Design a protein with these regions (language model features):
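C-terminal outer-membrane beta-barrel translocator/porin domains of Gram-negative envelope proteins
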Residues: 1, 107, 114-232
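Gram-negative/organellar outer-membrane beta-barrel architecture
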Residues: 1-118, 123-126, 192-196, 204-209
C-alpha cells in the first residue's frame, strides 16, 4: 500500500491525496488507485498570443478545479500492464476569466464538469526503466471525455508512444522515440494538450488537436565504476 499527500501554496494552491495498492487480488495481478485533487489559481494562463502564453493575476480565485479518479490496473505478465480509469472533474471560474477568454471553458455558465473513461496498455521490455540502454517500450491509450451525463464536454483522444534503445560499438548508445496523439477539435482552452515539450520551444505553446513528435538520442559512456557503500 502507498499514500501520497501534497499541499502547495502561493499563486497556485493545490491539495492532493492518493492511495495505491498494487495487489488487491489473490494472484497479485490486480491493483487499485484512488486520487483526489483540488487546485485553486489566482495567477492564470488564460490565452496565447503568437504562441506565447498570456497570464492574468488577481486577488480572487480565477480557476478552481476539483478532480477525482479511480483506476484499476491488471498485470497480464511481467512486461504487459492494462489500466482502466474513471475520472470526474469540476472546474469553476469567475467572471474575469470568462471576459478574458470566452472559450476558456466554452459554456454559457461559469461551471464545467464532466466524466472521463480511459484505457491504457503498456508493454515494457527496457533493461532499466529510469535510464534504459537496451530494449523497447510500447504505450497506447484511448480516452473519452464527456459521457453525456453533464453535456459540457465531448472529446475523444487516442495516443501512442514507442521507444527503442540500442547498444552500439565502442560504448556508444542510440535511442529513438515516437509520440503521437489525435483528439477532437474545438475544445475549451483549458483542455488543450500540454504534455509535449519540444527541445528549443519550451517557452512557446503551439495549440492543436493532433501531433507527432520524433526524437533521437546518442550517448557515449565515458567511465563506468561501481562504489561499495556498505563499508561507509
Amino acid at each position: 500500500d502507498g499514500i501520497f499527500l501534497l499541499a502547495t501554496f502561493g499563486f497556485i494552491k493545490e491539495y492532493e491525496f492518493e492511495y495505491f495498492n498494487p495487489y488487491i487480488t489473490k494472484k497479485q495481478k490486480g491493483g487499485i488507485q484512488f486520487n483526489f485533487n483540488l487546485k485553486d489559481q489566482n495567477h492564470l494562463e488564460y490565452n496565447t498570443i503568437n504562441h506565447i502564453p498570456v497570464f492574468y493575476k488577481s486577488k480572487k480565485s480565477l480557476d478552481k478545479t476539483l478532480s477525482t479518479h479511480i483506476e484499476y490496473s491488471h498485470r497480464e505478465s511481467f512486461y504487459n500492464y492494462h489500466y482502466f480509469k474513471l475520472k470526474y472533474q469540476n472546474t469553476k471560474i469567475n467572471d474575469s476569466t470568462k471576459i478574458l477568454n470566452e472559450n476558456y471553458i466554452n459554456t454559457k455558465k461559469n461551471l464545467n464538469q464532466f466524466l472521463t473513461i480511459s484505457y491504457e496498455f503498456d508493454r515494457d521490455f527496457r533493461d532499466i526503466k529510469n535510464y534504459p540502454l537496451k530494449g523497447f517500450r510500447l504505450n497506447a491509450s484511448i480516452e473519452k471525455t464527456g459521457l453525456g451525463i453533464f453535456g459540457d464536454v465531448n472529446k475523444l483522444k487516442a495516443r501512442i508512444y514507442y521507444s527503442q534503445y540500442f547498444k552500439l560499438k565502442k560504448k556508444f548508445y542510440y535511442s529513438f522515440n515516437l509520440y503521437s496523439y489525435v483528439s477532437s477539435n474545438n475544445q475549451p482552452y483549458y483542455l488543450f494538450e500540454d504534455e509535449n515539450n519540444v527541445r528549443g520551444y519550451q517557452t512557446y505553446l503551439i495549440q492543436g488537436h493532433s501531433n507527432a513528435i520524433y526524437r533521437n538520442t546518442f550517448k557515449k559512456e565515458l567511465f563506468n565504476r561501481i562504489w561499495n557503500l556498505e563499508k561507509y
